[in-house]
């Protein structure tokens, strides 16, 4: 389900290795790369959704990672109309996301892109922390900027510097309405078709 403003509740995952490089996944059968992300199901907390998506998309279990931080508020992006499925136009606007910063405590070979029946990625690599800002699709860039900047202060000291900070970038950011209003997390509802596929 969507919230009252037409945004789908979602989680995003920034997964670090011991060199503070980030996991970057290639969407299956495309040339598009992105961070792991996915919808929050009815009754799930953002943390529960994060662990589920981490296993479905990357094949990792909770014991393979350590949570370093999460964004305080929802970060939102609107999806351009031509990427929205026709039947969802008029009520679906985009995604609102809580982002998690995780550190891999296991090994690279603990990852398995085919841990579920419908894999999201068919390849992956480690990237320097700020590189995704240069290559992510335009309408997600502001949210990536805000998430990476907010989470950067929780990086282990070895890589604690904000290269490539940009001025004038904006993303939709709101207080956590569901927490403040006492509402339960909402059912995830696909409405978006991006170059990476439905998310």
From Swiss-Prot:
Accelerates the degradation of transcripts by removing pyrophosphate from the 5'-end of triphosphorylated RNA, leading to a more labile monophosphorylated state that can stimulate subsequent ribonuclease cleavage. The gene is rppH. PROSITE patterns: NUDIX, NUDIX_BOX. The keyword Hydrolase applies. Residues 6-149 form the Nudix hydrolase domain. Its EC number is 3.6.1.-. Residues 166-199 are annotated as: Disordered. This is RNA pyrophosphohydrolase.
């Amino acid at each position: 389900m969507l919230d009252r403003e037409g945004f789908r509740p979602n989680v995003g995952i920034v997964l670090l290795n011991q060199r503070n490089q980030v996991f970057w996944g290639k969407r299956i059968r495309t040339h598009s790369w992105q961070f792991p992300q996915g919808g929050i199901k009815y009754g799930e907390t953002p943390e529960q959704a994060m662990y589920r998506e981490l296993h479905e998309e990357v094949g990792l279990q909770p014991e393979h990672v350590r949570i370093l931080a999460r964004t305080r508020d929802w970060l939102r992006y609107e999806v351009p109309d031509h990427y929205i499925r026709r039947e969802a136009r008029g009520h679906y606007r985009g995604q609102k996301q809580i982002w998690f910063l995780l550190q891999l405590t296991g090994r690279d070979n603990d990852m398995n892109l085919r841990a579920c029946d419908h894999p999201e990625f068919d390849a992956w690599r480690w990237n320097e922390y700020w590189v995704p800002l240069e290559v992510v699709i335009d309408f997600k860039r502001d949210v990536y900027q805000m998430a990476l900047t907010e989470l950067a202060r929780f990086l282990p000291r070895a890589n604690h510097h904000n290269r490539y900070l940009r001025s004038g970038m904006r993303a939709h950011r709101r207080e956590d309405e569901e927490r403040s209003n006492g509402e339960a997390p909402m059912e995830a509802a696909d409405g978006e078709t991006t170059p990476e596929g439905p998310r």
